From Swiss-Prot:
Keywords: Ribonucleoprotein, Ribosomal protein. The gene is rpsI. This is Small ribosomal subunit protein uS9. One of its GO terms (biological process) is translation. Disulfide bonds: none annotated.
Amino acid sequence: MNSSSQRNTVVYWGTGRRKTSVARVRLIPGTGKITINGRPGDHYLNFNPAYLAAVKAPLQTLGLSDSYDVLVNVYGGGLTGQADAIKQGAARALCELSADNRKPLKIEGHLSRDPRAKERRKYGLKKARKAPQFSKR
C-alpha cells in the first residue's frame, strides 16, 4: 500500500482479501479502464453486473470512476471472492490517495474485511456440520 512514482505518474497500491482470494490493486491516473490479470475487467468477470458493480463501487462512492485506471493482479478463490477482494483493494488504494477518502469509504463498508470463510470439516461428520443419519434403534 505504498505510493510510488514511475515515469512521472503516481501509482497508488492497495491489497484486498475475501475468502481465499487476494487482490493487489494499482490505481493510476487515467480514464477509468479496469484491467484484471491482463484482461479487460468486464471480460474477466464474465460481464456479470453484480461483480462489475462491486469492483467499481469504491470509485463511484468518491465520484472518481472516470479519473483512475485500475490495474489488478488477483489470484485464489472464485469470481465472487475475487470481485470483493478487488473492491477492498481499490478502497485501500483510494485511502492512500487522500486521507479524506477514508470516512466515506468506511461508511459504505468498502474498507471492512469480510471474515466469512468456508468452515473446516470435523472428523465424525460428513461436512462441517452435517452429521451422519442418526438411528435410535
